Amino acid sequence: MEKHFLIGLAFLVTLVSCHERTDKDISNKFIGTWTLVRCIAIQQDGTISFPYGEKPVGQILYDTKGNVMVEITNQEIKKFSSENPFLGTPDEIIPAYNGLLAYYGKYKILADSSIIVHSITASSFPNWVGQDQARRFEFKNNNLILRTPSISSVQYELTWEKIGKSK
């Protein structure tokens, strides 16, 4: 009886250890800086649009302490007539605001469900401050693909490429 208990206990410890190692392996894949390759909006009918233009730029950074920082911009936005960012006209400010998303906060990975949660501390979109934003993740080659849940009948898919050494 004691022998069976010890064998069962050893199996359980091995199983838990493998699960923890898998979570850590997935966690390590996120660490580093990623550059935005593509950002698309997918309507319910399958129509695709480009909310930050067809050639958006951006970076997402994940560090080992659970911090995340994101910036996405539309490079097609026209420059302001003034060099002072606070003196733009409404015709300059509106597209500039709509062509930018930036936030930072903490992240946690729910490896079993392939979800990463960004807990937002500050954001260019004020409604997200203090919220958790969940993203389904997938690693494909040297890319990280993040998908939002449906937001107003639209799902966003962002493809990021790892900068530097591949993990």
Label each region the model flagged:
Residues 1-4:
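Positively charged n-region of N-terminal signal peptides that target proteins for export
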Residues 18-167:
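Lipid interaction determinants
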